[in-house]
């Protein structure tokens, strides 16, 4: 059964092109280390909530856009091994490829896929 890493972040709207380049580099690295796919989505219709919402979860500011991303892996074992290699890869080190957003507000988690229709 596939495994998925999911991410939500608030990215400065003016940094969309910078974010895309960062994400393209990261996607190549993840795929080299075993990921099946990497999907990056730029917020288009992401309403603010009263109790909960994507914007509230990442403390999205007026000049930011919510980004929703996920990475699929063939298994948790492949993900665990691949993630170690990804984190050590020189192409994704902060001095080489800094995150174009506030990583302190990044939300992420690993999920077992239970339906894939």
Model-derived regions, located:
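Short amphipathic alpha-helices in soluble, non-transmembrane regions
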Residues: 20-26, 82-90
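Conserved long hydrophobic alpha-helices within structured protein cores
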Residues: 33-42, 73-75, 81-82
């Amino acid at each position: 059964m596939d495994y998925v890493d999911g991410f939500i972040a608030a990215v400065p709207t003016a940094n969309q092109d910078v974010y895309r380049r960062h994400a393209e580099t990261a996607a190549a690295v993840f795929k080299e280390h075993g990921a099946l796919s990497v999907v990056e989505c730029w917020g288009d219709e992401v309403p603010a909530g009263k109790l909960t919402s994507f914007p509230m979860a990442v403390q999205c500011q007026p000049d930011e856009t919510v980004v929703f991303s996920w990475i699929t892996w063939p298994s948790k074992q492949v993900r665990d091994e691949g993630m170690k290699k990804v984190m050590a890869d020189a192409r994704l080190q902060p001095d080489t490829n800094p995150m174009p957003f506030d990583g302190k507000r990044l939300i992420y988690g690993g999920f077992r896929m239970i339906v894939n229709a």
